[in-house]
Swiss-Prot record:
Summary of the function given for this chain in its UniProt record: Major role in the synthesis of nucleoside triphosphates other than ATP. The ATP gamma phosphate is transferred to the NDP beta phosphate via a ping-pong mechanism, using a phosphorylated active-site intermediate.
GO annotation (BP), single: CTP biosynthetic process
Keywords: ATP-binding, Cytoplasm, Kinase, Magnesium, Metal-binding, Nucleotide metabolism, Nucleotide-binding, Phosphoprotein, Transferase
Catalytic reactions of this protein: a 2'-deoxyribonucleoside 5'-diphosphate + ATP = a 2'-deoxyribonucleoside 5'-triphosphate + ADP; a ribonucleoside 5'-diphosphate + ATP = a ribonucleoside 5'-triphosphate + ADP
Name used for this protein in its record: Nucleoside diphosphate kinase
Length: 137
C-alpha cells in the first residue's frame, strides 16, 4: 500500500469543510492511517516548504500556512500519491476540473484548500516531518 501526505490548509479548516474533504478521500478508496489538527509555527512552515525558499511567494506561503490550524493526514491506498493529486485538482482552483477538491472548496491559487505530496519519495519525507512511525496505523 502506498502512502501520501495530505494537508487541509487554513482556508478550508476555517470554512468547516474538513469532513467533506475527508469524505472525498475515503470515497475514492484512500484510508486515513494517521491524522492530527495542528497550528504550524513559522519555523515548521519554513522547514516544510524549504524547497520554495528562494521563490518570491515563500514568505506569503509561510504566513498563510501559519494563519490558522491545519489538518495533516497520512492517506493510504493503491497509487495514493496519484489518486490524491487527482482528487485535489490543479493548484489554481480556476483551472481545476469540476468536482475536484480545489474546484469545490478553494478560493485562490494561494488559499487552495489542500496540499498533497507530489511523489512517493516526497511523501515519505513529508510524512516523517509530521508523524512518528508509532502514530501511523
Amino acid at each position: 500500500m502506498q502512502q501520501t501526505l495530505s494537508i487541509i490548509k487554513p482556508d478550508a479548516v476555517e470554512k468547516g469543510v474538513i469532513g467533506k474533504i475527508i469524505d472525498r478521500f475515503e470515497s475514492a478508496g484512500l484510508r486515513i492511517a494517521a491524522a492530527k489538527k495542528i497550528k504550524l509555527s513559522k519555523c515548521d512552515a519554513s522547514q516544510f516548504y524549504a524547497i520554495h525558499k528562494e521563490r518570491s511567494f515563500f514568505n506569503d506561503l509561510v504566513d498563510y500556512m501559519t494563519s490558522g490550524p491545519v489538518v495533516v493526514m497520512v492517506l493510504e491506498g493503491e497509487n495514493a500519491v496519484a489518486k490524491n493529486r487527482e482528487l485535489m485538482g490543479a493548484t489554481d482552483p480556476k483551472k481545476a476540473a469540476p468536482g475536484t477538491i480545489r474546484a469545490d472548496f478553494a478560493e485562490s491559487i494561494d488559499a487552495n484548500a489542500v496540499h498533497g505530496s507530489d511523489s512517493e519519495e516526497n511523501a515519505k519525507n513529508e510524512i516523517a516531518f509530521f508523524f512518528a512511525g508509532r502514530e501511523i496505523c
